[in-house]
Every structure is written in structure tokens, then in C-alpha cells.
């Protein structure tokens, strides 16, 4: 057997051995995006790792700072609100479905709301709608509370006059 046949035969064997380790697999998943603890636990179990291995991996990642539900929830809320223009109600539902703790969700949404300026985002949106009511309905469907909608619309209307 020459070198090229041997290489073809053994291609990926070392890679597969590395992929079998739960910590390496978890780090590979975290390389692409921030993940929640429950989400990572499910992925590791689905991959076939034992419960003890999964828990020790998650503990290790928490100690090293790679796994932080609070930071992940904040970044998720910020992206959903700023980029996709979802309101706090929809973001809360999405985070609950991902298995995030209620307290963490509340803190993340509060922190994200402090940082986001919806007025600038919605000024651009206003041109798409015929009147104020259409924009109000759109925002309500996107998960904004009626009091927040009124506050935002009043600031937008007041800023243009």
C-alpha cells in the first residue's frame, strides 16, 4: 500500500476521535454562536454522550466562561429586538421555549430595552404604513406592549414636527 492509498483509507480517523470527546464537540458548537445551557445539554445528549460526561462538560465550560445563560439571553434579546424588531413579549416567549430561567429572561430584556433606541428604527418603518393605526397593529403583533407603542409613536410624531 502506497502513501496515497493509506492516506485515503485513514482520512478523518483522527478527526472522528476528537469529535467523540464531549468538550471538543461542545466547543465546536460554541464556535459558531453563543448557546444556552439547556440547548447545549440537549445537543450533547443527542450526540450520545453519557449524562456524567455531559454534566462535567457543562460545568467545565461554565468555569471557563464559555457558557453563560445570562449573557446569551441578553445577546439573544438584543438581536431579536434590534435586528428583527420583535418586542419584549415575543422575545420572552422565544427565550422560554429555549429553556432559559424566568429571572434571567427579565434581566436580559430590561438590559436590552435600556440599550436599544426603537425611535430611530421605527422612523424608517413609518414610511411603509399608511397611517398610525397600521403601524400600531404591526408593533402589537411583533410583541410590543400598548403603553410602549404609544410612547414610541408619540416620540416619533413629536420629533418630526
UniProtKB/Swiss-Prot annotation:
Compartments (UniProt record): Cytoplasm
GO cellular component terms, semicolon-separated: cytoplasm
RNA-binding recorded as keyword: no
Pfam families: RecX_HTH1, RecX_HTH2
Entry annotated with the keyword Ubl conjugation: no
Organism: Thermotoga maritima (strain ATCC 43589 / DSM 3109 / JCM 10099 / NBRC 100826 / MSB8)
Keywords: Cytoplasm
GO BP of this protein: regulation of DNA repair
Functional summary from the UniProt entry: Modulates RecA activity.
Family recorded in the similarity comment: Belongs to the RecX family.
Protein name per UniProt: Regulatory protein RecX
Amino acid at each position: 500500500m502506497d502513501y496515497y492509498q493509506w492516506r485515503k483509507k485513514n482520512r478523518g480517523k483522527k478527526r472522528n476521535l476528537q469529535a467523540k470527546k464531549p468538550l471538543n464537540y461542545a466547543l465546536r458548537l460554541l464556535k459558531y454562536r453563543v448557546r444556552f445551557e439547556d440547548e447545549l445539554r440537549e445537543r450533547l445528549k443527542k450526540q450520545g454522550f453519557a449524562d456524567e460526561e455531559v454534566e462535567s462538560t457543562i460545568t467545565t465550560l461554565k468555569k471557563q466562561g464559555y457558557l453563560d445563560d445570562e449573557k446569551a439571553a441578553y445577546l439573544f434579546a438584543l438581536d431579536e429586538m434590534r435586528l428583527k424588531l420583535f418586542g419584549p413579549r415575543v422575545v420572552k416567549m422565544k427565550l422560554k421555549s429555549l429553556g432559559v430561567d424566568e429571572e434571567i429572561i427579565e434581566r436580559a430584556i430590561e438590559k436590552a430595552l435600556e440599550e436599544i433606541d426603537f425611535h430611530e428604527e421605527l422612523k424608517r418603518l413609518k414610511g411603509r404604513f399608511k397611517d398610525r393605526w397600521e403601524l400600531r397593529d404591526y408593533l402589537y403583533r411583533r410583541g410590543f406592549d400598548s403603553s410602549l407603542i404609544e410612547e414610541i409613536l408619540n416620540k416619533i410624531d413629536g420629533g418630526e414636527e
